[in-house]
């Protein structure tokens, strides 16, 4: 026990991950990869190929699914690293995946803010309902926020301070530890303002006005289905932001202000897990927004039930055949 404790302390002092974290990360990321890949591939296919009447919220959902897929496709490299304990994919690719940890929540929050503003227009400003069908503006908004986020993330590829330099065997601590980003704290806190606080305040502002309008009965002209759908979207977005993104960014700010050297942070690891969970929780949004996605999920579930029933029947028929054969042999 003493040897294990000393080994873990040595790992933490060197900035590497304890074995418990690696095992938990392997299990967690495996589940996220399998569920998230199926959910977001299905969503992207539904929104881009089977949805005939596209609206602004459809465009936003396509971008959410695409962003989730980009992030999810990086998970197998993480899992390989945690399983093998070394990084064979090169230093530059490690930088890219490390930057992706910051890129994903930054862009995701803006996309969720766009969806919140879209629901604000649908409930509080129904006279501008035609704007909700103007997909051109939605495409420009999404393209602009993609470019803006990429531009502010590129400097992370050029960091001088690198926790993985001169490591043997090669490591890639950047994909889970964000403490090495202290070297660019000015950029970090600028990013916190523009990619966390501003979209968060936009969402809160939209929700406050929407709730105020609902309580004062200013939305009586809206169809009940539109109200119900919008409220479900709002509640889902609020829960997702509070669970997945707020803890991550609070931890990010705290770690950037701490004066200690780079080391493994259990709180940082946990909030990073929560942030990754967002790629799967988006399924609730997809299910609420799109009837086609609902139908697709239901068809998959029915098909699985059908396969199970076929297997049960085949097992039963096989057991009956074997029983009849035994009886014939006895006779």
From Swiss-Prot:
It is found in: Cell membrane; Cytoplasmic vesicle membrane. Disulfide bonds join 94-172. SUPFAM superfamilies: Family A G protein-coupled receptor-like (SSF81321). The keyword Endoplasmic reticulum does not apply. Keywords: Cell membrane, Cytoplasmic vesicle, Disulfide bond, G-protein coupled receptor, Glycoprotein, Membrane, Phosphoprotein, Receptor, Transducer, Transmembrane, Transmembrane helix. Expressed in the eye including cornea, retina, iris and ciliary epithelium (at protein level). Expressed in spleen, liver and lymphocytes with highest expression levels in intestinal intraepithelial lymphocytes. It is a multi-pass membrane protein. InterPro entries: GPCR_Rhodpsn, GPCR_Rhodpsn_7TM, GPR18. One of its GO terms (biological process) is CD8-positive, gamma-delta intraepithelial T cell differentiation. GO terms for cellular component: cytoplasmic vesicle membrane; plasma membrane. Gene3D superfamilies: Rhodopsin 7-helix transmembrane proteins. Its main location: membrane. The modification Phosphoserine is found at residue 322. The chain crosses the membrane at residues 27-47, 57-77, 96-116, 139-159, 192-212, 237-257, 269-289. Disruption phenotype: No visible phenotype. However, reduced number of CD8alphaalpha gammadeltaT IELs has been reported. In addition, GPR18-deficient mice display impaired resolution of infections and diminished responses with RvD2. Glycans are attached at residues 14, 188. GO terms for molecular function: G protein-coupled receptor activity. Residues 1-26, 78-95, 160-191, 258-268 are extracellular. Signal peptide: none annotated. G protein-coupled receptor (GPCR) that plays a role in diverse physiological processes particularly within the immune and nervous systems. Becomes active when triggered by various endogenous ligands including endocannabinoid N-arachidonyl glycine (NAGly), delta-9-tetrahydrocannabinol or resolvin D2/RvD2 derived from the omega-3 fatty acid docosahexaenoic acid (DHA). Upon RvD2 binding, facilitates the resolution of inflammation, aiding in tissue repair and homeostasis. Belongs to the G-protein coupled receptor 1 family. This is N-arachidonyl glycine receptor. It comes from Mus musculus (Mouse). The gene is Gpr18.
């Amino acid at each position: 026990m003493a040897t294990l404790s000393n080994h873990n302390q040595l790992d933490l002092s060197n900035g590497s991950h304890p074995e418990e974290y690696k095992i938990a990360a392997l299990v967690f990321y495996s589940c996220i990869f399998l569920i998230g890949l199926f959910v977001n591939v299905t969503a992207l296919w539904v929104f881009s190929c089977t949805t005939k009447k596209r609206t602004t919220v459809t465009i936003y959902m396509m971008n959410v699914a695409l962003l989730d897929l980009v992030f999810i496709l990086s998970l197998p490299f993480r899992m390989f690293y945690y399983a093998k304990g070394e990084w064979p994919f090169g230093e530059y690719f490690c930088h890219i995946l490390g930057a992706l940890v910051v890129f994903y929540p930054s862009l995701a929050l803006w996309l969720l803010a766009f969806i919140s503003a879209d629901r604000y227009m649908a409930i509080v400003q129904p006279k501008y309902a035609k704007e909700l069908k103007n997909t051109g503006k939605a495409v420009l908004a999404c393209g602009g926020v993609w470019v803006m986020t990429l531009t502010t993330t590129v400097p992370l590829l050029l960091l001088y301070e690198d926790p993985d330099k001169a490591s043997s065997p090669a490591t890639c601590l950047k994909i889970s530890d964000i403490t090495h980003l202290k070297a660019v704290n000015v950029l970090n806190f600028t990013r916190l303002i523009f990619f966390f606080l501003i979209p968060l305040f936009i969402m809160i502002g939209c929700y406050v006005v929407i709730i105020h309008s609902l309580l004062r009965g200013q939305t009586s002209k809206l169809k009940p289905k539109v109200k119900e759908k919008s409220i479900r979207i709002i509640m889902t977005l609020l829960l997702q932001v509070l669970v997945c993104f707020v803890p991550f960014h609070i931890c990010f700010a705290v770690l950037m202000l701490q004066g200690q050297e780079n080391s493994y942070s259990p709180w940082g690891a946990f909030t990073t897990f929560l942030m990754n969970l967002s790629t799967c929780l988006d399924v609730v949004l997809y299910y609420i927004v799109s009837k086609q996605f609902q139908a697709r999920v239901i068809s998959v579930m029915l098909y699985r039930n059908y396969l199970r029933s076929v297997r049960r029947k085949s097992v039963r028929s096989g057991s009956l055949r074997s029983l009849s054969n035994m009886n014939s042999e006895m006779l």
